[in-house]
Amino acid sequence: RDPNGYWCNWTGSSYVNPLAGVIGTVYDIKEAPNGDIYICGIFDNVSNKGEIVANTKGIARWSKANQQWEAVGDPDGVNTSIAVIYVMAFDANGDLYVGGYFTDLADIANADYFAKFTVSTGLWSAVGSGIDYSVQAIAISPEGTVYIGGTFTSAGGNTDCKYIAYFDKTANDWRPLSTGLNSFVYALKFAPDGRLLIGGHFTNAVGTGGDFICWWDGSAFGSFENLGATGLSDYVRSIDINKNGTIIIGGIFTNAGGDSNANKIAAWRG
């Protein structure tokens, strides 16, 4: 954190204020294919050298070319009184998807809790026919299918889309993964073998297994208990995979696989 806000650069030896302040909380940072940096969170605006940048509520872009903060979606940004954006993801075309707690983003009907920003046109759009509550996680498959997780219990009017769903481009609407899960999803990550790893507050994703973490193989949920593992003591907030294929999770748990040293962070090397 820099002295003027909640954003700074690490040069390798020190933190540097990038001529800006972000008064609030930054939840996610993503780099666009062109090198621009996008940040999102819960903040009213950002500033360049002390000058407030209009229409940067909840999301802003650091322009690599102009070396300054800019609104996302000229000229009005997200243009909503409530803008809490938790998560972002770029697709293969360089377009941006955002999830959070907001309704009618940029005054667009059905742009509720999830929306798309087409970088080439600078326009926001709805994705499908709407979601009923907040989106906390986004993952895009190698084939370009968008998956979301969160606290919602319906997407596109489908009540089987409980806490997790994917977007069917052909039907132009949301579809369920089986009949969904029984509680919140906070993390989604595709593994190298194509499985979608899912972390959250749910239990019993697979019979009596799959508490707090499971996977989706394209047709069914699976669990690490199926591989002989002991489960977690509490929920998962984040999932990542290192270059060696090791799955790393973080969360509220104090025990993973029976190991009390796996306290809030653990690795799976199976």
Where are the model-predicted features located?
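Extracytoplasmic surface signature
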Residues: 1-270
